[in-house]
């Protein structure tokens, strides 16, 4: 099945995030305001996050997490070299403070992250996600991936960002759980 849609991501330091994905008119929204996380989708409706799902969202919403991996992970173990889309990548198993291990694949020549394999808690249980990052471009002196391919047992999709802007004013209220409709 080949579906298309749009995605909008809003982030604000230190740890607020809003993601809106619209596919075939159906909206999937997820937010975190620094304290509380929420999701709104056609299958589960509007709900607050709790437990492991909330902690993962808190970690993923850390604006600076790509720059401070030692804050997220307690131990790193280089396990070898693998190919990711025809590129050599160092494979690093990174242990999370709350338990579990993510696999990070770093491009040998550039050091940029090419793939992240991690487990996420959802209303449907624990799901393993693989996220491939590519088409890195310079945005205000920072290399950012403009293409993100996410796959799991339940889904497989590619997000292509048309533009990324830094230092855009973000209203704090947009990150909070909306009122039920």
Regions found by a protein language model. Give the residues of each.
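N-terminal mature ectodomain segment of secretory-pathway/periplasmic proteins
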Residues: 1-45, 73, 77-78
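Short, low-complexity Ser/Thr-rich regulatory SLiMs
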Residues: 11, 80-83, 135-138
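Short, solvent-exposed secondary-structure boundary motifs
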Residues: 1-3, 17-23, 64-74, 93-97, ...
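Acidic/charged, solvent-exposed loop-and-adjacent secondary-structure segments enriched in E/D, K/R, S/T
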Residues: 38-64
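Short, solvent-exposed loop/turn motifs
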Residues: 2, 27, 37, 45-47, ...
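Gly/Pro-enriched, hydrophobic low-complexity segments
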Residues: 88-179
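Short amphipathic beta-strand/extended segments with alternating polar/hydrophobic composition
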Residues: 4-10, 30-34, 47-54, 106, ...
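Short, conserved active-site entrance elements at the starts or edges of catalytic domains
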Residues: 56-91, 112-117
């Amino acid at each position: 099945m080949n579906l298309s849609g749009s995605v909008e991501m809003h982030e604000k330091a230190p740890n607020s995030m809003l993601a809106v994905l619209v596919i075939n008119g159906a909206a999937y929204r997820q937010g975190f305001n620094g304290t509380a996380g929420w999701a709104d989708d056609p299958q589960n409706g509007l709900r607050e996050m709790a437990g492991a799902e909330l902690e993962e969202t808190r970690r993923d919403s850390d604006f600076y997490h790509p720059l401070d991996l030692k804050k997220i992970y307690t131990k790193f173990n280089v396990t070898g070299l693998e190919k990711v889309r025809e590129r050599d990548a160092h494979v690093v198993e990174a242990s999370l403070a709350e338990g579990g291990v993510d696999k990070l694949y770093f491009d040998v020549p550039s050091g940029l992250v090419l793939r992240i394999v991690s487990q996420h808690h959802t209303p449907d249980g624990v799901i393993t996600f693989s996220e491939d990052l590519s088409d890195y471009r310079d945005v205000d002196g920072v290399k950012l991936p403009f293409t993100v391919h996410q796959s799991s047992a339940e889904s497989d999709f590619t997000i292509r960002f048309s533009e990324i802007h830094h230092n855009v004013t973000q209203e704090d209220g947009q990150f909070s759980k909306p009122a039920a409709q």
